[in-house]
Amino acid sequence: MGHREELIERSIPFLREVKDMTPGADMERWLNKKYGENSDLYKDLSRLIKIGLEEGWAANIEISGPNYRRSKILEPTPETFHFSITAVYMNSKDPRAFEHDDNDDVLRGDYHGHPYGELNMVVPLDKGAQLKGLQGWQGPGWTCA
């Protein structure tokens, strides 16, 4: 089994557990408490996604140049309870590399929608990197949208 398949298989029990939950602030707190950066699940998935970046199967499609990439690791399937798995890479070390109408120095992903919500596992590659979630800025851990 390759690392991509290992990531998918490791995700399925987690997806089974969260399939009937509603993304929001309560779920974000729950995820960070139960599956935060010191949990086995977080450690396994973050290790596999980092390997995916190295092997070139995770976040390998440029959206706005090499500093903003993503890839669909898995389309929704019955096996994953109709969740998809997507990897996103954002390098905001040089905010001038990203144009914003409001001249804000915060990197934003392209607009996209999720009718049933979104769970984001935040895997910083650099110390101090964060993603804004419902509870504010989040380093290693989870956000919901």
Identify what each model region corresponds to.
Residues 55, 59, 68, 142-144:
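Polar low-complexity intrinsically disordered regions enriched in Ser/Thr and small residues
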Residues 61-109:
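A short glycine-rich, His/Asp/Glu-containing loop-to-beta-strand
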Residues 128-145:
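Short acidic-glycine-tyrosine-enriched beta hairpin
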Residues 1-58:
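N-terminal leader/capping segments at the start of a protein or of a new domain
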Residues 87, 120-122, 139-142:
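Conserved hydrophobic/aromatic beta-strand scaffold that supports enzyme active sites
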Residues 110-130:
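Short, conserved beta-strand element in jelly-roll/cupin
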Residues 51, 62-64, 115:
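Generic alpha-helical scaffold signal
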